[in-house]
């Protein structure tokens, strides 16, 4: 979930000014490795593409189960190559070179505010090389993700990027889909003078040391703590709306070996009258 923009090097003094949690990538890498570990114990399967879809009710506190704004991600991961692979390929000696990292950057479906100005602390807390001509945020490539983690003192494996980057992209897309559901009742179409819909203005990863009030209360009640938190600022036709997103690692069942479940709890912050109003109207079914 870290950084949509490019992540090239920057002076340490400037980087220290940004309120970014450098452990965020490591958190997601840990989740990815856990899924890969589970997949190695399962029967070999053909590679599957990343899928993002709502699943059954989560095994979280009752307040989560009844939350219409919460959703699951069930992401299948690549298992080892099928045992029926060509024998001549299996006989080839292992390559000594490290896996090549893809430099392709995927354009997200998330529009960004056009007035985001460059600064020592960019709105996405990464060093940017500019927005896509489409006006949407751009996801980092495998190489950018890998180099950013290594530069910040972690020990990433190039092979992990094949898993981490799809997780990063899929979870961002799901979070944005949830925000669009929240925003739908308040957005006017362009034909009626609207601005065309909300845009993502900025975001930041706060990690687990800054738990949201809901997450803290449920953790005190004995429920699972989130493994990450992000705050997103949405531009709704000139009005800034803040959202909080808690990320939970879902419990996998016996039939989903090699798959990693994510539970996203997305809602407006209660730090403004607009946030209170949106959550109250949703609670009584009026939005």
Curated annotation (Swiss-Prot):
Cell compartment(s), UniProt: Mitochondrion inner membrane
Catalytic reactions of this protein: holo-[cytochrome c] = apo-[cytochrome c] + heme b
A Pfam entry, by short name: Cyto_heme_lyase
EC number: 4.4.1.17
Signal peptide residue numbers: none
Keywords carried by this UniProt record: Heme, Iron, Lyase, Membrane, Metal-binding, Mitochondrion, Mitochondrion inner membrane
Record bears the keyword Membrane: yes
Region (Disordered): 1-63, 81-100
PROSITE patterns tied to this protein: CYTO_HEME_LYASE_2
GO terms, molecular function: holocytochrome-c synthase activity; metal ion binding
Biased composition (Polar residues): 1-12
Main location: mitochondrion
Feature: compositional bias, Low complexity: 31-63, 81-92
GO cellular component, one term: mitochondrial inner membrane
Family (UniProt): Belongs to the cytochrome c-type heme lyase family.
Role this protein plays: Probable lyase that catalyzes the covalent linking of the heme group to the cytochrome C apoprotein to produce the mature functional cytochrome.
Protein name: Putative holocytochrome-c1 synthase
The organism's taxonomic lineage, starting at the top: Eukaryota, Fungi, Dikarya, Ascomycota, Pezizomycotina
